Amino acid sequence: MLASRLENDYFDFEEDELDILLFLKSYETKYKKIFDLKYTDVFLIFDFEPQHPDLHFDTIQKMIRYFNQSDERGKLFINYPMMQSYRHLKSLPDNAFLQTRLYKQDFKHYKEIVSNESFNNDISTYDYTTFVSLAFHHLTKLLFIQNKENRAPTMDDYDHLNYAKIFDIQYENLKNNFIWIVNTCILILIDYKPKNFFDQITKHETSFKLPYIEQS
């Protein structure tokens, strides 16, 4: 796990200019050619997975503050509790998604829960409209977690999304035996061209299945 490697071998990485590809290359010799390539952006995707026996929350807190720009150091996205949360909606739109939580007793069964509750488990059937609608749902929930606001997010909201604050809130929630179910890596769809994403929402609002917006 990257967090444990940083903790053990490069504990003060946030005080230096860490080349994440070079660091990974030193471990993953099998994929040396991949790390030798040039990239315009680097995305790191973690699962929160509070039930995992190898927890490094302090290091991850530092990582999420350090890896905050995809075209420079790299950008870290954390899914709560794991990747499958991107499709943990019972319908599209799903206005109840804002309030969905996962409780401690269900952490180990999350994949099964998603499989039983998702509106569609077959990602091969997802189209552009589906992915945009999902990204908007998750962004709306992240805004709710961060600011306790229940409204449609704007591009300015996206620009001021504080992943470190969201992680801290989720970490505190964990002490109360729950976390909010939300996916952040799906926001890569927005991160690539934020203005284009929000322009599409504005111009073609009724084409998407969006929460918390009155559609004509």
Residue ranges and their predicted role:
Residues 2-15, 21-216:
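C-terminal accessory helical subdomains adjacent to catalytic cores in phosphodiester-
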